[in-house]
């Protein structure tokens, strides 16, 4: 597992970020989308 920083924009227009562990960037993006109901779109996913 690798550590990823996922930066996203919420439905309110606020920028937010969360850390997660995943096998790849697509899995990290999916993890955030399933955990957070207020995500409008993902801005970027960065491997740390």
Go through the PLM ranges and name each one.
Residues 4-5, 19, 48:
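Residue-level detector of intrinsically disordered/flexible regions characterized by low predicted structural confidence
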Residues 34-48:
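Short, mixed-charge low-complexity intrinsically disordered segments
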Residues 13-23:
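A short, exposed loop/beta-hairpin motif centered on an aromatic-Gly-Thr core
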Residues 1-14:
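Short aromatic-glycine-(Arg/Gly/Cys) micro-motifs in beta-strand/loop hairpins
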């Amino acid at each position: 597992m690798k550590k990823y920083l996922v930066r996203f924009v919420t439905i309110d227009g606020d920028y937010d970020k969360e850390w997660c562990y995943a096998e790849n960037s697509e899995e990290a993006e999916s993890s955030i989308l399933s955990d957070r109901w207020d995500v409008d779109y993902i801005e970027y996913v960065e491997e740390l």
